[in-house]
C-alpha cells in the first residue's frame, strides 16, 4: 500500500483558476486540471527562477518529489497550449502559508495567506505588504 502524499507548502493561492482558448465555446473544449501545488512549482522554478533544491525546501518536499511535481505541471500546461484545451487550477494536497500582513493605508495588521485580490479587512484597501 503506497504512502499517503505529504501536504505541500504553498505560499500564494492563484488569483486566476481557469484559462481557455479565446473564441472557442466551452462545450467544444476538453479540460486539463492543474493542481495548486503544480502551479506553485511552476511559479517558484520558472517565474521566480529558483533552483530545484530551494524550490523543494520552500514546498517542504524532497528534490525528486519537486522534480516530479514540476514535470507533471509542465506536461499539463504544454498539452493545454499545444492542443487548445481549457486549463483549470484546482485541488491538490497543500497547505497555504500564513504571513503577517500590514495595510499601508490604515496600518492594520492581520495574519493570512497571500492572494492576488486580497483586501485589508479594516479599510478594504488593496495596498498591503508582508511583514517579516
Curated annotation (Swiss-Prot):
Entry-linked Pfam families: DUF134 (PF02001)
Record-stated family: Belongs to the UPF0251 family.
Source lineage: Bacteria, Bacillati, Bacillota, Clostridia, Eubacteriales
Top-level taxon in the UniProt lineage: Bacteria
Protein known as: UPF0251 protein PTH_0588
Amino acid at each position: 500500500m503506497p504512502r499517503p502524499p505529504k501536504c505541500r507548502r504553498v505560499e500564494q493561492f492563484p488569483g486566476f483558476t481557469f484559462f481557455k482558448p479565446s473564441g472557442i465555446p466551452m462545450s467544444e473544449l476538453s479540460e486539463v486540471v492543474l493542481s495548486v501545488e503544480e502551479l506553485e512549482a511552476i511559479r517558484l522554478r520558472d517565474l521566480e527562477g529558483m533552483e530545484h533544491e530551494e524550490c523543494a525546501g520552500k514546498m517542504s518536499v524532497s528534490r525528486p518529489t519537486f522534480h516530479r511535481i514540476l514535470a507533471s505541471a509542465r506536461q499539463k500546461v504544454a498539452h493545454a497550449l499545444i492542443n487548445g484545451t481549457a486549463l483549470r487550477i484546482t485541488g491538490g494536497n497543500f497547505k497555504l502559508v500564513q504571513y503577517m500582513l500590514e495595510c499601508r493605508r490604515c496600518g492594520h495588521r492581520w495574519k493570512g495567506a497571500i492572494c492576488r485580490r486580497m483586501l485589508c479587512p479594516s479599510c478594504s484597501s488593496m495596498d498591503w505588504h508582508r511583514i517579516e
